[in-house]
């Protein structure tokens, strides 16, 4: 029997940040543009780097981080565009998949940065999220991404 938890999930939250100095904010949907990124996102630009177009993170990893650190940091504060539920993201590196109707390719793991550690005011953020900080993906087809979209 196939465990669908590993090959199909859903979009739980969507977040964008207009520039480096602004906080990431939750939105109900976002327009993904092939080769550019997410409309309204600070990294959105012509001929964008493949690995900078959209980022994802698992709510399960966020919950685990909060449990082991004794914190209650909201998912949006993990600075990723899409918070997923019910899908293992690490196994998707090098693969193409869909977020709703938008096709993406996972290029590499999204390693946590020192800015994230400083914003959490936690010593071991980078260590704890090293292999669970999400994915960096390229947008292969344009379209809207909505909360509750299926990831497959």
What does each of the following model-derived ranges do?
Residues 1-152:
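Metal-cofactor-dependent catalytic cores
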